[in-house]
Amino acid sequence: MTSQVSLREADDIARARRTARTLKTVLALVFLGLGGWCVLAPGMVETLALREEYRHLSPTSALLLQCFGAQAVLVGSLALLSRFTAITFLVFGLLASVPFFVFNVWFVWVSEMFTAWMLLDFAGNASFFLIGIIGWRLMRGETEPV
């Protein structure tokens, strides 16, 4: 009976680790996708995301969006290549989402600078929060990172 319980526990641990690894990859892909979009098509991002009265569509605004996107690509690359522990998931989930929720609320709903397209950013931030919490729960008690 104990060997069956041990096998079941080992299977549960392996499944949790696979899920955590998949979540880490999804987190990285969100950063890489949205960041890459800013790098490769800053004019499109500016046109879709900013209300007309705030659009500049200048080389400077394109450069700023590309810098923003490059930082997201860097974070996505690091997330993809790094090994996450439970604490990494938790800290990443909180730091990669909570400050940006404040940003989204302020600039989408309070100052109304952004269009509804900016809800893609909000969805990305929500995914970071959920992935961080779920990854943390899956990896609690694990000593080997994924």
Q: For each of these PLM feature ranges, what is it?
A:
Residues 28-47:
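Transmembrane alpha-helix/helix-exit interface in multi-pass inner-membrane proteins
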Residues 102-120:
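Membrane-helix boundary connector in multi-pass membrane proteins
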